[in-house]
C-alpha cells in the first residue's frame, strides 16, 4: 500500500469545486472490480483529506473518485 499526499492548495480547490450536495457525472473510473459506466451520475458526499471525492452514485455505489486517476465533471 502507498500513502498519497496532496498539496493543501489542491485539496482546497477540490473542496471548492466539489462541495457536498453537488451533482457530478462520471467520465472515467479505473476500477476493475466494479461496473461504473461513463455517464453515471451521483451526489458528492465529501472530499477526504487525500483528495478522494466521495459520491453517492445512482447505481447505489459509494465509491470515491480518486483525484488524478478517475475523471468526473460537475453538472450543476
Language model region names:
Residues 2-76:
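Basic/aromatic-rich interaction segments and small domains that mediate binding to polyanionic partners
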